[in-house]
């Protein structure tokens, strides 16, 4: 069972929670899912931003989030039928990287065309094909924050929007549940989908 939630924070909530960067938001989301017997992270989230008055964060999880001290949260179960469609519109914020075969180091993917090609090439491993003409790449940039006084983290970011066709249901479900790409604990990898009826 998967649960979809929306956390809404107003300006006063963000100030009280001291959300100043991506790590501040990471800390708030993690507080909604206390550790249970050392089990690994079982949730994903995506910061949808908002207007001057309200910020919205989408959350996908295997358990219900705690009631937050600040803000409002709305949760509902995702019906199994929702994940049995063949075609979806999608949006996903990804930390796009590639691993060097020799050094095993990861390097960021740069440039809109390279990002476009990278996503299409990776899609089959995630269980779907992308309609190439539908794929848009936006919000290309870098997210940086101080995790503590001595550690600064930097992640490349890009948002991909388009249409997909499921070609391997098990892989698709696994990547919907666990997210795609790296840095999923920092708001990357949540595949936001809407079914599309094909005639």
Model-derived segments and their meaning:
Residues 1-199:
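RNA-interacting cores
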């Amino acid at each position: 069972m998967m649960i979809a939630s929306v956390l809404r924070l107003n300006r006063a909530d963000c100030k009280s929670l001291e959300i100043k960067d991506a790590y501040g938001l990471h800390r708030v989301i993690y507080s909604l899912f206390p550790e249970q017997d050392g089990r690994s992270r079982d949730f994903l989230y995506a910061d949808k931003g908002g207007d001057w008055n309200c910020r919205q964060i989408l959350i996908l999880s295997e358990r219900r989030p705690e009631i937050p001290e600040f803000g409002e949260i709305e949760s509902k179960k995702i019906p199994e039928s929702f994940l049995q469609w063949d075609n979806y519109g999608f949006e996903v914020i990804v930390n796009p990287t590639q691993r060097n075969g020799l050094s095993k180091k990861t390097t960021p993917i740069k440039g809109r065309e390279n990002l476009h090609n990278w996503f299409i090439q990776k899609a089959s491993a995630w269980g779907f094909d992308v309609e190439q003409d539908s794929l848009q790449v936006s919000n290309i940039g870098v997210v940086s924050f101080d995790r503590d006084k001595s550690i600064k983290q930097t992640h490349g970011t890009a948002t991909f929007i388009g249409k997909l066709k499921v070609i391997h249901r098990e892989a698709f479900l696994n990547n919907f549940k666990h997210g795609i790409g790296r840095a999923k604990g920092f708001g990357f990898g949540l595949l936001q989908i809407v079914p599309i009826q094909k005639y």
